[in-house]
Amino acid sequence: MAGVKSLQPRLISSFLGNNSIRSTQPLIHLFRFDLGRRHVSMQLSRTFSGLTDLLFNRRNEDEVIDGKRKRLRPGNVSPRRPVPGHITKPPYVDSLQAPGISSGLEVHDKKGIECMRASGILAARVRDYAGTLVKPGVTTDEIDEAVHNMIIENGAYPSPLGYGGFPKSVCTSVNECICHGIPDSRPLEDGDIINIDVTVYLNGYHGDTSATFFCGNVDEKAKKLVEVTKESLDKAISICGPGVEYKKIGKVIHDLADKHKYGVVRQFVGHGVGSVFHADPVVLHFRNNEAGRMVLNQTFTIEPMLTIGSRNPIMWDDNWTVVTEDASLSAQFEHTILITKDGAEILTKC
């Protein structure tokens, strides 16, 4: 599909990095966030085909912000960490082309649900352990090393590693970084906030979760953003259940963000997750009129990203790291949930 000129890029997923998605939908639909797909099957191209420049304003990294906080700068990225041969790897790791969002809902049987619970619990344990490492002076690369080791010691594979060329086992997004921060040599500083996004592949199923942690003494403005972002996720999960419209998730999150005058990032979405890392449904975190209802025994993520200032993203030249255009703080929380007859079960909760 990469060479078909009539096809236009359409959607950025929650974890796509330097990959374009193509479908038969016109490009303008991307900017209107018209995500009605009518069962369009999508694939990724390793060439970005200008999509990054269309979606993300690339700005000079030397722009300055107020004197209270230094603008985030990239550090040195260490070599990719090895994974023992006995660890089962997701199919995309050895592929020359990263997968996109797979069309079609995955509805789990009893065994699938058990596997999802196991991967979700492990992801949650790793996430919480990583949070204990957040201290001034600790580098995000050190956090990545600890996460990597804990995952493989438990017989699982760190899902981000090798996904479309992503070089690390976890995403670490500090301060104005909205998502997909690459762990590097930068030491955390007192007052930072950091989102740690963990996904594990265990027994053929992915468990996906993230949380934003405080580093040292964090000011009240940052604390409030983090607390409200967590509240938005909790409220969204509370309304989920069989037959509920997906669009209600976006309304709940957007309404709470508006109440506190926060921005809601639109370019990144929640998604189905299971035996495939990213699948239907596409879960929007802002108000929308998209069709679709939740189905018993399906699993998907909800992962709102709220900002104090501009909700518009800038992508760094690494084609992964996404930051707010005005360097304002961003926070995110994420859970994988299972739709049950009584509502929703949080799978990524210890």
From Swiss-Prot:
It comes from the Eukaryota. SUPFAM superfamilies: Creatinase/aminopeptidase. Its main location: plastid. Residues 1-49 form a transit peptide. A divalent metal cation 2 binds at residues 208, 271, 303, 334. Residues 71-90 are annotated as: Disordered. The modification N-acetylglycine is found at residue 50. It is found in: Plastid, Chloroplast; Mitochondrion. GO terms for biological process: N-terminal protein amino acid modification; proteolysis. Keywords: Acetylation, Aminopeptidase, Chloroplast, Hydrolase, Metal-binding, Mitochondrion, Plastid, Protease, Transit peptide. It catalyses: Release of N-terminal amino acids, preferentially methionine, from peptides and arylamides. One of its GO terms (cellular component) is mitochondrion. It is an enzyme of class 3 (hydrolase). One of its GO terms (molecular function) is metal ion binding. A divalent metal cation 1 binds at residues 197, 208, 334. Its cofactor is Co(2+); Zn(2+); Mn(2+); Fe(2+). Belongs to the peptidase M24A family. Methionine aminopeptidase type 1 subfamily. Removes the N-terminal methionine from nascent proteins. The N-terminal methionine is often cleaved when the second residue in the primary sequence is small and uncharged (Met-Ala-, Cys, Gly, Pro, Ser, Thr, or Val). This is Methionine aminopeptidase 1D, chloroplastic/mitochondrial. It comes from Arabidopsis thaliana (Mouse-ear cress). The gene is MAP1D.
